[in-house]
């Protein structure tokens, strides 16, 4: 899980999700692409 000020989709499988007012990126293909805004 990377914590970044600006989250971006890193591949075509990445999805931007908003949970509890935190923007996250989840990826089905590569778990290393997981990010959250912080």
UniProtKB/Swiss-Prot annotation:
The keyword Ribosomal protein belongs to this UniProt entry's keyword annotation: yes
GO biological process: translation
Disulfide pattern: none
GO CC terms in record: cytoplasm; ribonucleoprotein complex; ribosome
Record keyword Ion transport present: no
Entry-linked Pfam families: Ribosomal_L36
UniProt keyword list: Ribonucleoprotein, Ribosomal protein
GO terms, molecular function: structural constituent of ribosome
Assigned protein family: Belongs to the bacterial ribosomal protein bL36 family.
PANTHER family cross-referenced by the UniProt entry: 50S RIBOSOMAL PROTEIN L36, CHLOROPLASTIC, LARGE RIBOSOMAL SUBUNIT PROTEIN BL36C
Name of the protein in its database record: Large ribosomal subunit protein bL36
Gene designation: rpmJ
């Amino acid at each position: 899980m990377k914590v970044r000020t600006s989250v971006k989709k890193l591949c075509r499988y990445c999805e931007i999700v908003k949970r509890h007012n935190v923007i996250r990126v989840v990826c089905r293909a590569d778990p290393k692409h997981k990010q959250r805004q912080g």
